[in-house]
C-alpha cells in the first residue's frame, strides 16, 4: 500500500465533477464542468502523475466508471443528456514494457500508453440524465448497468423504447466492428412509479450457483434485483427499509435519497451484509434467502451449490451509523470487517468496525475505530487551483 499523499494538477478551467480510480489505483480519470475528460497515470514508484489523454465531449459529463482490467482499459462516461460514451485505451504492451525495463528507460512505454486512446462506442440515450454507472463483475462479461433520472420530456421523445419512468438499463459489449465496441441492450429494471430517479448501483460479487444480483438505490429507498434465467428478466427480491433516522431527515430536509451502497465480501459468512447511506445515516442490512413457498425451511446462506434462482430475500436492519455530514461514498475492505465512509462537505473519512460476540458475522454493534481528517484549507485551495488529491 502506498504511503503519504499524491497530488496531481488538474489543468482544467472548470470544476472537477467526478474522479474514478482503476482497480490497481495506478490511473485516475476526471471529468470537469467544461466537458473535458482527463486520464492520468502514476505507474512509477515516484509520486508523480502524467497526463495520458484528454477528450472533449459535446455534452456535459457527470459520472465515470472503469471496467475490470481483465477487459482492458475501458472507461464509461455518463452525461447529463442521458448518453454514455465509451473511452478506451490501448492494450498492455508486454514487449515495450520488457524492452523499457532492460534498457532502463521507460520513455517508449510512456509514449505507448499515451497513444491509442479514443472514443470507441456510445450507448443509446436514456430517458434522463445518467445518475449511476456500475460495471458487472468480470465473470459476467463486459456488462454495464446505467441508472437514469426520470424526465417527462425525454420520455415523450423516446416513447416506450426505453421506458417511460425511471429505470436501470443493462448493456453488454457484444463485439468490435470497425474498431468500435458494439453495445446491445441486455435488460431493463423498471423502478417503482413513485421513484423519481435511480441514485446508486452496486453489484454483488459473482459466485457459483448464484444469479447476477444488483442493488439499486432510488429516491424512495432501494431494492435488490436478480436476473432470472428462465424468463430472461430481472426480478426484485426485496426492498430495503429506510431507517427511522433517515426518515426524520427526509421530513426535515424534504428528501434524503439512498446515496451510496456497497456489498461486503461474502467469505462464507452465514448471511450477506449490505451498507447503504441515507444522508448522514448509514444503514447496515443483513440478507438471507427467503424460504420457497413449498418449504418452510430456508438455507441461511445465499451461496448454495447448483442454485440458480432465488425466491426472495429476507432483510434485517442490523444497525445504523450516524455522521455529522452526509455520506456520499462508502466501501468495505476486502474481508468485510471494516467500513469506510467518506463525508460530503467535510474532508473526513470514518472507519467503522463491529464489536462484541457476533462481530465475525457483522451482526454486532459497529463503532468508529479511526478517522482520517484532511486539511480544511485544502478545500478552498482546491476550488481555486483545481487540485485533485
Where do the model's predicted regions map?
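Inter-blade linker and blade-boundary elements of WD-repeat/beta-propeller domains
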Residues: 2-12, 46-63, 92-95, 102-132, ...
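Beta-strand-rich domains and repeat architectures in extracellular enzymes and scaffolds
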Residues: 9-35
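Short coil/turn segments within WD40 beta-propeller repeats
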Residues: 17, 34-38, 81-85, 150-154, ...
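Loop/turn segments within WD40 beta-propeller blades
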Residues: 20-25, 65-72, 134-141, 202-211, ...
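Beta-propeller domains
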Residues: 28-55
Amino acid at each position: 500500500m502506498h504511503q503519504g499523499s499524491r497530488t496531481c494538477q488538474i489543468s482544467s478551467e472548470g470544476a472537477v465533477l467526478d474522479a474514478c480510480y482503476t482497480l490497481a489505483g495506478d490511473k485516475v480519470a476526471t471529468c470537469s464542468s467544461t466537458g473535458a475528460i482527463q486520464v492520468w497515470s502514476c505507474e512509477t514508484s515516484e509520486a508523480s502523475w502524467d497526463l495520458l489523454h484528454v477528450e472533449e465531449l459535446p455534452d456535459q459529463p457527470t459520472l465515470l466508471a472503469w471496467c475490470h482490467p481483465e477487459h482492458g482499459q475501458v472507461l464509461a462516461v455518463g452525461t447529463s443528456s442521458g448518453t454514455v460514451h465509451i473511452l478506451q485505451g490501448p492494450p498492455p504492451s508486454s514487449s515495450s514494457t520488457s524492452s523499457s525495463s532492460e534498457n532502463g528507460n521507460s520513455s517508449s512505454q510512456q509514449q505507448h500508453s499515451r497513444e491509442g486512446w479514443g472514443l470507441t462506442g456510445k450507448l443509446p440515450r436514456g430517458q434522463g440524465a445518467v445518475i449511476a454507472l456500475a460495471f458487472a463483475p468480470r465473470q459476467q462479461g463486459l456488462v454495464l448497468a446505467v441508472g437514469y433520472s426520470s424526465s417527462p420530456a425525454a420520455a415523450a421523445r423516446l416513447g416506450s423504447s426505453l421506458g417511460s419512468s425511471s429505470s436501470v438499463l443493462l448493456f453488454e459489449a457484444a463485439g468490435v466492428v470497425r474498431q468500435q465496441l458494439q453495445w446491445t441492450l441486455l435488460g431493463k429494471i423498471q423502478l417503482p412509479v413513485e421513484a423519481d430517479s435511480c441514485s446508486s448501483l452496486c453489484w454483488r460479487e459473482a459466485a457459483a450457483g448464484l444469479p447476477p444480483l444488483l442493488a439499486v438505490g432510488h429516491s424512495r429507498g432501494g431494492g435488490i434485483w436478480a436476473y432470472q434465467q428462465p424468463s430472461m428478466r430481472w426480478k426484485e427480491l426485496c426492498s430495503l427499509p429506510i431507517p427511522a433516522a433517515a426518515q426524520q431527515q427526509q421530513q426535515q430536509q424534504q428528501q434524503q435519497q439512498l446515496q451510496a451502497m456497497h456489498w461486503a465480501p461474502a467469505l462464507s459468512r452465514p448471511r450477506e451484509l449490505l451498507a447503504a447511506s441515507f444522508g448522514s445515516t448509514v444503514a447496515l442490512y443483513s440478507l438471507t434467502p427467503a424460504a420457497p413457498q413449498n418449504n418452510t425451511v430456508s438455507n441461511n446462506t445465499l451461496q448454495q451449490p447448483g442454485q440458480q434462482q432465488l425466491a426472495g430475500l429476507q432483510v434485517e436492519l442490523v444497525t445504523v451509523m450516524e455522521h455529522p455530514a452526509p455520506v456520499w461514498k462508502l466501501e468495505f475492505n476486502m474481508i468485510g470487517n471494516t467500513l469506510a465512509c467518506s463525508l460530503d462537505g467535510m474532508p473526513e473519512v470514518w472507519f467503522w468496525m463491529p464489536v462484541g460476540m457476533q462481530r465475525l458475522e457483522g451482526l454486532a454493534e459497529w463503532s468508529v475505530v479511526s478517522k482520517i481528517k484532511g486539511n480544511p484549507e485544502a478545500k478552498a485551495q482546491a476550488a481555486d487551483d483545481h487540485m485533485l488529491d
